[in-house]
Amino acid sequence: MADPASPPSFDAIFAQQPVRRSSSTSTSSFANYTYSALQQHQQFNSDAPLVDEPQSLSEQARKQQRDPSKDGNNKRYLDMMSGLADGYGVINGRRQESLRKESLPFNPQEDSTLIATAPKRGERNGLGRNGYSSPIGDIMFGPEQTIPNQPQQPSQQPPWGEGRMSEQSVHYASVQQPQYSSFQSSGPGAGSAGIDYLPRGTTSSMNDSMLSSQISPYLNHDVASEGQPPQQQQQQQQQQQGEWGQEFIGVEQQQQYAQGEGQSNGMEDMLTMGDESPFESELQRVISNTSHPSQYPSRTSSPFPQQSQSNMVPASTVNQTRTESFPASRSPSPFAPQQASQTEASNHVVSTPSMGQPTYPRASSSPRTNPNSPFFNKPQSPPALIIPNSPVLPNIVTQSTSNNHSKGLNQPHTRHASNGAGGLFPPSNPALEHLTGMAGISPIAPNADGPMICIQPSTPISGLKEGRGLFDAALRRAGAARGAQRQGPQGQGESQEDRRQDGFNVPSPQSHPLPRTLSSDQVNQGVEMQGMDFAAQMQSYEQQGWANDTLRIAGPSRPRAKSDSIIPSPTADSFDRQAFLAFIGAGNAQPPPPNVEMQPGYVDVSEQWRNTVSAWKAGLGEGELNSQPTLDPRLLPGRESNEAVYQQLLMQQQTGQMPRLDPDQLHQLTQLEGQRARFSLNTNIAPPKYEPGEISPTSMVFYQSMGLYPHAAPELSGTVSAPWSQTAFGQVPGPGPVGHPATAGPAQQHFLTPTLSHATVRRRSFGGGEHPAMGAGTPGYGMEFSSPFAGKSVGQIRGVNMGHRRAARSEDFGRGGTGWGVGAGGSTAEFLQSITGDDGSLLPPSNRGHAMSHSRHSSTSSIRSASPALSISSQGSSFSHHSPRMDMPDSIYPGHPIIAPATPLQVSGLYEEQQTPARVAKMKVTSVATEVASTSRRTNSGIFKCPVPGCGSTFTRHFNLKGHLRSHNDERPFKCLYEGCPKAIVGFARQHDCKRHMLLHEGLRLFECEGCGKKFARLDALTRHHKSEQGQECAITHPLPTNFDGSPMSESQYKTYKGIKSTPEGSGRRLSSTASGSGSGKRRSKKSETSEED
């Protein structure tokens, strides 16, 4: 009895519906497919009780029991059976080769969508092993699947015997477990592979030709074997015994039918089954998601490894249930969890045989042991449409499976069930086991409205973790081929390490003396490679077998940082292509192709190349004239000094003695050695004070004592890039006429560099004694060569009014002074007013006495230069930072005391006596774009005009003119305070440029674009960003502020407008006078910083 609480099965619902008769024009409905046993019994008009009939009844008995007049379709069955008995070759005029290609006719208006059919699999050579194609059950229906923790079918069925009735009395309405098929194996013989049942409604809707074409591939094998010798029939039966037949019916039943106990006709079973029909059982299994295995045996070997049979018990004590009779199927479904074996199986999986019956070991169907098995021609599960919320469907089993790899090659691989451990489907949730269908893993609730259909694919991905997929097989073949190629000169040890590195060819460090590209010694690799030239490296690589290694780039590899390569190779890191090609050609044992012509002497190119380099090295230390090396281009002035040092050190190391160089090369090497020993700039420590008589390390005497000469001054720290005529102390021409500038003449206002006066000029202080720090890099350096009175007597210059002295330093004394020779007296504005005319031009010395008379600090004891252009090229002021004394040449006051001037001296004749040609480093230093930009944002007229001929630049402030004049002579006195920075040597001509540069070292970018958020260190960089293509949108949405008249703002105006501080709080940068070299230790005033910022 069925449980009243349990939902009715799918078949029970359709069994209560009235039988619908199909017309001649429509296809059969689902009621014809669910043709119940009760209706079949009533249609036969039999008064006998409804019992299962044995299969040994003859066809004639069935015909007598049937009444053909009650169903018009019986005549079609009789005609079909008569056609089969006529010889099986031709059925109703159609040949056997007319195989079925499509599924049964389907009517979308009447037939149910739950029926899933699949086209028949392609036959091998058209037919099967015995001349027939495979049955549809072997194609569609998947393996046995069980649900864990569910009771199995309690009823069991013994094998059918000859003349015995079945003890099975399960009626259609008494199905207890809808999860399992209620149809038990009726025990067809090993040769009965035909269709056992055909719905009656189907035959009524098909003509004879269609029926014969669809039935022909599934005929009984026994009929086809009639007329053959008994030995051949027995041989065919034995061939079928060792295959998949025993997987579905069990070994005992198969042996019984093989001995003749269970011989039956498939068509007889189809017409005479009184209980639940096989087709209904197969239909119920199709619409379920458990994919029970088909009852029909297969004629082909299984492509999958054997799987162990679980819970094997002797057949003599307990009859095999349907689950135990089918230990494995042709294609395991990914939904089905395999049962773990309790006992170790033998090499061949067999069922426990009955007493006295021989056992037939199952044929090995593993692709590893049976290479002839069809490995890629079977689908892994049949397609099916699944409605998860159907009451007859069981729960979806989502437990993943794993393979046990500890078994042997021919031993069964037991598949253990593991909860939630990987797999292709979500892990099972024990809390959702009471739900039906896909409720456990479906995003739609079980009772939700709408369709819930799950399509089970015909070929799901499976076996990925078991190594039986297509991709795994390809990987195994590729790995085997790669391992075979590695066996050879590399040896087994290296091959093992290669496999351990997952295919990467990483040799052991002990196998070669040279570092390789993928070796771990990456740091010292470039250093080790410097000992050999390129050809020697290629030859060494060839000895190690690197020519055959196609996975690496031949040649040395070194870190990219130049500092890691201490000394470059003597060949200047050159790459010889011919030597490289010769190395590659020598590594290949094969001769060159016949169509490639070898150049004469091509093989000896590397040897010749190496001999040439060796001869060049040997010639460095020899005394022959022909072996003297030519001048290395890298030793010429203007080249990078580090390369010359490296070359000279390399020559010294290789030859053991200093190379014989010409005086110019030796002179440059001495300069570079002195540069290496220079003092680093330290802004945290005050500069030391030297007593009189000591040599300051920043003076030119210090460098002259080391053999350095002034023309290398641009490469020395603390000096300026001044011309030779203004920085030379030695090798100066003898006394001659006094050279003086002619810039102050009334007729011409030129900026001219004075000529040299005396070679023996020595610095003397008016206070007596040597000046402690009056060398290069100190204020006042170079003043004696700028004085126009160097060759004059005391009486000639006694009455000259030398201007005023300043009590405060100029704001740019911090990095070397103003360069104007301004004394310690009045302010810079007063001085500029005294030397500048109304039109902005510089006044001649004859007219400056009247303009200087109003100076509040004017004194007869003060001495200054008569022209502002006298010491523009110098780096310092005329006065020291700690002494009011001024240095003047000894020739001015040869042993005479200081005499205060009484009357002004008219020196205009000095400028008319001698005029020298203009000598400036650069005549034009301002670009057109800079001049236009400066003029466009200028609010006042430029009253300060550059005196250099051809320049014509004007400025509104005096310190802008001073910086501009430094640019003419390529002076850059303002150095970056960060060691290692190129600007620490090159410097800047303007102090605000230097401060703005040092903001980059501190990571401060004060000018930010409000549109995109980019930051810039300079306002002009922000302006260029707005003019670029990327910043056009920013310029439209967030334009830069302008002045009231529409002119663009300068940096100082922009900072004031935005409230930007030049030195943000917390930056820790202290620009004091100590850092600038003044030594006073006082912070610079806020006024001077802001004034220099413009």
UniProtKB/Swiss-Prot annotation:
One of its GO terms (biological process) is positive regulation of transcription by RNA polymerase II. Changing S288A: Increases CRZ1 localization to the nucleus. Residues 166-187, 201-217, 286-324, 343-379, 396-412, 507-519 have a biased composition (Polar residues). A zinc finger (C2H2-type) spans 944-968, 1007-1029. Residues 148-159, 228-241, 252-262, 325-342, 477-493, 858-881 have a biased composition (Low complexity). Residues 1-29, 44-81, 93-428, 477-519, 835-888, 1037-1094 are annotated as: Disordered. It is found in: Cytoplasm, Cytosol; Nucleus. InterPro entries: GLI_C2H2-zinc-finger (IPR050329), Znf_C2H2_sf (IPR036236), Znf_C2H2_type (IPR013087). Disruption phenotype: Decreases virulence in a mouse intranasal inhalation model and intravenous model for infection. Decreases virulence in a moth model. Decreases urease activity. Decreases levels of: laccase and melanin. Hypercapsular with mucoid colony morphology. Sensitive to: calcium; lithium; sodium nitrite; high temperature; sodium dodecyl sulfate (cell wall stress inducer); Calcofluor White (cell wall stress inducer); Congo Red (cell wall stress inducer); caspofungin (cell wall stress inducer). Abolishes filamentation during growth on glucosamine carbon source. Signal peptide: none annotated. Keywords: Activator, Cytoplasm, DNA-binding, Metal-binding, Nucleus, Phosphoprotein, Repeat, Transcription, Transcription regulation, Virulence, Zinc, Zinc-finger. Pfam families: zf-C2H2. The modification Phosphoserine is found at S103, S288, S329, S508, S569, S765, S810. Induction: Induced during glucose starvation. SMART domains: ZnF_C2H2. DNA-binding transcriptional activator that interacts with calcineurin-dependent response element (CDRE) promoters. Activates expression of genes required to maintain cell wall integrity during stress. Activates expression of genes required for transepithelial migration through the host blood-brain barrier. Required for adaptation to host temperature during infection. This is Transcriptional regulator CRZ1. The lineage of its organism: Eukaryota, Fungi, Dikarya, Basidiomycota, Agaricomycotina. The gene is CRZ1.
